[in-house]
Amino acid sequence: MKIKPFAVEEWMNAWEVGAKYNIAETCVDSISMNDLFELTGEDKTEFLNRLCARRLSYGDIEGLPEFRKGVCGLYKTLNIENIVPTHGASGANHHVFYSLISPGDRVVSIMPTYQQLYSIPESYGADVQILHLSKENNYLPDLEKLRRLVTPKTKMICINNPNNPTGALMSEQLLREIVEIARSADAWILCDEVYRHLSQEDGWCPSIVDLYEKGISVSSMSKVFSLAGLRLGWIATHDMSVVKSCLSHRDYNLVSCGVFDEMLAAAALKHRDKLLERSRKIVRENLQILDDWVGSEPHVSYVKPKAGTTALVYYDLDISSYEFCEEMYKKTGAFVTPGDCFEVPHSMRIGYAYGKQDLIDGLKAISEYIAMKTR
């Protein structure tokens, strides 16, 4: 099977270790187990005693019930039988395509987005059609263009909400209109929702699974809950044919997700409100820092993110984004992601949810590099 190189991951793998100012990171500032117990008030001794007494078997093959129950609390209409645990959201996306998409199937995906959403189905021989998101439309899908791309042969529409890399957020009304387009073709909607709940304004972030019977939500413990080291995600859907197919295909390459990961994730999700409060505080304070910097730096511009942890920032230098980001890294230690990883030239993705001082110092380093190039 041929597949395009995963541009973002190859870039991160090559440069992340050793970065002086890591503002390419997309998870909310990660926490330790000690931090988790302190934040949640969970009894560490009691938890560790239960964990140490647990036999290290495969565990619950279809997922620890307490973990799946915790995941259900992130939605309005799901029960534990609607949840399929996976190794991260990347594993969840892969399992959805592996389970549902065949050669010749028509798949419509937005761009820019996480590359999995178009490169994996393309590698399986799907007819992948791209719906380009524009800066002029605040990176929201143009519904007329989507209608033209969706045909009776369309098997799946792939979206990402909130969007990576732009931070755009689709409203419930917009999602409902996309649902009607999908329903006209009896197509699934796969929505990568790893940044859901991280909006800049208070209120419930709608999920595709609460709006559409053929909606498939993918998420994880990594971005919002700062627990990427657990490598634990999930597929959520009301469509039990999808659940059945994903579990069947999962038997071939995953079996189960691991006793330790699911126990710790279940403990975290019992106290999700406390973790979400921490994460929202970080992204809201840090976005203000980023917004102030964009306003003061004459050579950059962006559409201010509505949610998530990332922003797509344009620069006005006549230099490719790979060259810009690599040279800047070597000269200043500032680590960002080239926009060309998302097929958006003359831009960079900045992750603003990591350490506040890293963000401040990293943005200063970007300004120093730009000043160096524009003298």
Range-by-range predicted roles:
Residues 243-250, 268-291:
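Structural signature of PLP-dependent enzymes
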Residues 77, 147-148, 318, 327-336, ...:
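PLP-dependent enzyme catalytic core of the Aspartate aminotransferase-like
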Residues 81, 99-121:
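Conserved PLP-anchoring active-site segment centered on the Schiff-base-forming lysine
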Residues 135-200:
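Active-site phosphate-binding strand-loop segment of PLP-dependent enzymes
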Residues 124, 184-185, 297, 332, ...:
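Helix C-cap/helix->beta junction micro-motif
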Residues 266, 282-291, 302-315:
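Conserved glycine-rich beta-strand-loop-beta hairpin in the small C-terminal domain of fold type I
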Residues 2-88, 270, 373-375:
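N-terminal small-domain helix-loop-helix segment of the aminotransferase-like
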Residues 211-244:
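Active-site PLP attachment segment
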